[in-house]
Amino acid sequence: MKINYTLILISCLTLAACNSGQKRMEQGDYDTAVYQAVKRLQQKPQNEKAEKVLRQAYTLAVNEHTNVIVYQDKTNNPFKYDVMVSEYEKIAMLNNAIRRYPMYKDLVELTDVTDELIMVRDGAASAHRKEGVRLLNSGNKQRAREAFIQFIKANEYVARTVTEEELDNAQNAGTVNVIIQFANSRNFFRDYNSDAVFGAVRNNFKGTRYRFMRVVEPGELSFPADEIVQIEMEDAHIGGVDFTKNS
């Protein structure tokens, strides 16, 4: 059997390039190249090819993320800080990955973005809070729901940017208060005290609160009804006995 040593050599070189992150770097996927280079160095410390890739790919990755940040900062997009947070977080993730290789300090100087992350997170939180207030002031239930989501996002960036009271106000403003009414469609039910059945079901719903829906009682003053939902039942199960069929 004739062995193709050339093919084996090419395969080995290709595998080495992939393991070191060289191929990813050549494709412009600098972040992945960094991660692959770090992984290779953890497996084989001081691997020259991986060290070279790490130095080059990290610089290229940071430059790429920084360019996006600079561009976004010049725009009038009120939510530009969302993108900037994402880009700074990607740099921070690269830094954390590189720190897992003990000898990284001899290879790269990490770009600390701690202060920048704090600043852009504040900007993102402020932008979402401002948008939430604008939506809430429209006096529209749908807008109030959107305001609630904006407030949630604000607090995801910086905790307590929006108070619990403000969140409750937005949620209440966007909530539909619903009365549930039951109607029996068969005379059969009237023979088996259907009021008791419906009453039990209604009590299970009473006071139920979903994110933007609340079940209320007729005439309840605290939460005036917005809609009435009428449920027509055709069967019931009482005490484990099936009364579906009238026979």
Predicted regions and their residues:
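Positively charged n-region of N-terminal signal peptides that target proteins for export
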Residues: 1-5
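Sec-dependent N-terminal signal peptides
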Residues: 6-10
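C-terminal motif of bacterial Sec signal peptides marking the signal peptidase cleavage site
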Residues: 15-17
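A structural "domain/chain start" motif
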Residues: 22, 26-30, 35, 42-60, ...
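Alpha-helical segments in soluble extracytoplasmic regions
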Residues: 87-97
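A short, hydrophobic beta-strand-centered structural micro-motif
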Residues: 216-247
